[in-house]
Design a protein with these regions (language model features):
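Feature recognizes metal-dependent phosphohydrolase scaffolds
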Residues: 1-171
Length: 171
């Protein structure tokens, strides 16, 4: 994906990579969702064990730390809002840049690249935040709330990628 971002930029375009729960888990050293194949991709990195090699890739000085920390969790393109997992009513109170900045501050902290963010912003990386919440995709937000969120952000639709559908097809 890093290569695709560079190629898109070189061609005058853009390629967005959104941070989600797996990037957050990598930043805090939670490797539960790394397959053996994923771990093997890090075999050339320094470290005594495979898990140390993977963890080292995502902390200060690691090859992916800055890249991940600088990827957004939410991006608006035209009238579309892309977000990893979903939205809740909190989205109405923050600008997209503010949301991305809060998430970035937590990534930097977990990587050892920044101070501890205010604990009052911890919700942004928790179950109700844009990397985890499934309320929108599970239909647990009213149409009125959705309309209000869309209007506040000036978008026509929200596109999420976190939740797998039963048919594995877009719904």
């Amino acid at each position: 994906m890093m290569r695709l971002q560079k190629e898109a930029k070189d061609a005058g375009g853009r390629f967005f990579v959104l941070n989600g729960n797996h990037e957050l888990q990598a930043a805090i050293g939670d490797l539960r969702y790394f397959s053996e194949d994923d771990v093997m991709k890090f075999s050339e990195l320094p470290g005594d064990t495979r898990s140390a090699k993977v963890r080292g890739a995502f902390v200060r000085g690691g090859p992916y730390a800055n890249w991940i920390a600088n990827n957004p969790v939410m991006v608006r393109v035209g009238r579309d809002l892309f977000v990893h997992a979903g939205l809740e009513s909190w989205v109405e109170y923050f600008l997209i840049d503010e949301i991305n900045a809060m998430v970035k501050s937590w990534f930097l902290y977990f990587q050892g690249n920044g101070p501890q963010p205010l604990l009052s912003t911890g919700w942004i990386i928790g179950q109700v935040g844009p990397m985890w919440t499934r309320l929108l995709s599970e239909g647990r937000i009213s149409e009125e709330q959705i309309s209000s969120m869309l209007k506040t952000k000036g978008v026509a639709r929200v596109i999420v990628g976190h939740t797998v559908t039963a048919s594995r097809l877009p719904e």
